[in-house]
């Protein structure tokens, strides 16, 4: 299907699938300006990760250098072009029948992977989580349907790859095998009680700042 909005065209195709017994919505979302979005993030990455401007790309490891600032910014304030994703996030919520948008808060961030960067096994606070790959370099993300499950589901990434699923699912991803930077954005959709829980538990020694970077989801979906 194709959308036309904000002086861009968007080709997209989303499918409802399963990871074990859990919901997965996955597919491609390809705006006509995806390359420009990628270049803008690469060129301005130091605004969110200061050491990315002073460290060699091949030596830069943002969890080590800039972990304290990893979630200290409102991603959509820095990179407003990413707001084009919200009609598709709303479509996912509608598909799963979760349409009480007023109860949710939205948080997103940018993942910048130089060569060799990866993410280790983890999950998220919130009800829903997903990611959108702006530029892939041949990586795969693996999911476990249950925390102690032996079953593993592999999702091969690509430019424009979009996912939406329950936030509690454990996942990890393979290292970036190329010199080019792999760029993606991740997002969580949480109740305010979950935001407070993450803040109070000070998860990863930065949870106390979560309240400053969440946005009421209804304000982003343009619904009353």
Where are these regions (language model features)?
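Fe(II)/2-oxoglutarate
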Residues: 1-18, 208-224
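Non-heme Fe(II)/2-oxoglutarate
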Residues: 2-97, 118
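Positively charged, low-complexity intrinsically disordered regions
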Residues: 9, 36, 45-46, 123, ...
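Intrinsically disordered, low-complexity segments enriched in small/polar residues
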Residues: 18, 25, 184, 205-206
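Glycine-rich loops and low-complexity Gly/Arg-rich segments
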Residues: 49-52, 133-136, 189-192, 208-216
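Short N-terminal helix-initiation segments at or just after the protein's N-terminus
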Residues: 66-80, 108-109, 128-133, 206-214
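Aromatic-acidic/polar surface patches that form glycan- and anion
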Residues: 78-82, 123, 178
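Catalytic core of non-heme Fe(II) oxygenases with the double-stranded beta-helix
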Residues: 101-174, 180-184, 188-203
